[in-house]
From Swiss-Prot:
Name of the protein this chain belongs to: Bifunctional protein FolD
Catalyzed chemical reaction(s): (6R)-5,10-methylene-5,6,7,8-tetrahydrofolate + NADP(+) = (6R)-5,10-methenyltetrahydrofolate + NADPH; (6R)-5,10-methenyltetrahydrofolate + H2O = (6R)-10-formyltetrahydrofolate + H(+)
Organism (species): Sphingobium chlorophenolicum
EC number(s) recorded for this UniProt protein: 1.5.1.5, 3.5.4.9
Binding site for NADP(+): G165, K166, S167, I231
InterPro entries (UniProt xref): Aminoacid_DH-like_N_sf (IPR046346), NAD(P)-bd_dom_sf (IPR036291), THF_DH/CycHdrlase (IPR000672), THF_DH/CycHdrlase_cat_dom (IPR020630), THF_DH/CycHdrlase_CS (IPR020867), THF_DH/CycHdrlase_NAD-bd_dom (IPR020631)
Alphabetized Gene3D superfamilies for the sequence: Leucine Dehydrogenase, chain A, domain 1, NAD(P)-binding Rossmann-like Domain
Role of this protein: Catalyzes the oxidation of 5,10-methylenetetrahydrofolate to 5,10-methenyltetrahydrofolate and then the hydrolysis of 5,10-methenyltetrahydrofolate to 10-formyltetrahydrofolate.
Biological or metabolic pathway of the protein: One-carbon metabolism; tetrahydrofolate interconversion
SUPFAM superfamilies xrefs: Aminoacid dehydrogenase-like, N-terminal domain, NAD(P)-binding Rossmann-fold domains
An example molecular function term from Gene Ontology annotations: methenyltetrahydrofolate cyclohydrolase activity
Length: 316
């Protein structure tokens, strides 16, 4: 029977470490790490996402500020706000909630954010650093995927990994992180020929295609680890709906372990976003040191230990 990798338990462990580190940071420097979230327009889903991110940051002791701009905000006004936040030494992380209104070039906006404050990891500088293994801020969902994966496979060297999904937000960054950890990586899309056969040879499958139940049980070999990033709402016969992943999880009991949906990668995403805020603040304060690539601990414990699979306690 496959083990369930609990993102909820892993997120709780990460947030506990963050709370202690934020308290130490605040004691040493006399101020808490500060996040500024920028929200343009009145999209209900965006408001919910921003509220959750701010609540999580405040929960661990960080300062969080929200800038709300009208839906008819000009690109020039938004860029001017970002420029002012870039110059403000009291601001350690900047998050611009996507999507943006049609009159605003999202790429131009993201490129304007100071890469040292780009907690989403979308700036070209951070993308380059990730691709070359030279550090930089890592997108939060891929980071969460790696923490959960390392909880059951501490040593990834030599593993065959398949990533289904080519997005700049999840698929490509996850592939880069897997490569850096020594995996042989195949990146696929929903329309890749012989996708089932490709997956059957994989030790690790990361499903991030946005297609409900794309990965069937016969695609997964015995003993594989499956990370399900998909969040899809499907209609039920009684008129209600439910959230499902990209993997038919009821068919993969022969896998070694998998992340459930909900309760898997989702809870880790916001927790890892908070970790990026803290890392950005440390860099600005010149008080952090890296214990290994993509490690987030001052003392060699905490987030670095989570990433390496130690003391996670996430498998049930």
């Amino acid at each position: 029977m496959a083990s369930i990798i609990s993102g909820t338990a892993a997120a709780e462990g990460l947030l506990a470490d963050l709370t202690r580190d934020v308290a130490r940071f605040s004691q040493v420097h006399g101020y808490a790490p500060t996040l500024v979230a920028v929200l343009v327009g009145d999209d209900p889903a965006s408001h919910i996402y921003v509220r959750k991110k701010i609540e999580q940051c405040r929960k661990v002791g960080m300062e969080s500020v929200e800038h709300r701009l009208p839906a008819d905000c000009s690109e020039e006004d938004l860029l001017a706000l970002i420029a002012s936040l870039n110059a403000d030494e009291r601001v350690h992380g900047i998050l611009v909630q996507l999507p943006l209104p049609a009159q605003i070039d999202s790429g131009k906006v993201l490129d304007t954010i100071d890469p040292r404050k780009d907690v989403d990891g979308f700036h070209p500088v951070n993308v380059f650093r990730l691709s070359t293994g030279t550090g930089g801020l890592v997108p939060c969902t891929p980071m969460g995927c790696m923490i959960l994966l390392r909880s059951v496979l501490p040593d990834l060297k030599g593993k065959q990994a398949v990533v289904i999904g080519k997005s700049n937000i999840v698929g490509k960054p996850v592939a880069m992180l897997l490569l850096e950890q020594g995996c042989t990586v195949t990146v696929c899309g929903r329309h890749t020929r012989n996708l089932a056969e490709v997956c059957r040879n994989a030790d690790i499958i990361v499903a991030a295609a946005g297609t409900p139940h794309l990965v069937k049980g016969y695609w997964v070999k015995a003993g594989a680890v499956v990370i399900d990033v998909g969040i899809n709402r499907i209609a039920l016969d009684d008129g209600r709906s439910r959230i499902v992943g990209d993997v038919a999880s009821d068919e993969i009991g022969h896998a070694a372990a998998f992340t459930p949906v909900p309760g898997g990668v989702g809870p880790m995403t916001i927790a890892c976003l908070a970790a990026e805020y803290v890392q950005a603040a440390r860099r600005r304060a010149w008080c952090w040191r890296r214990t290994n690539r993509h490690s987030f601990s001052l003392e060699g414990e905490g987030y670095g230990a989570l990433l390496s699979g130690a003391k996670l306690g996430a498998v049930g």
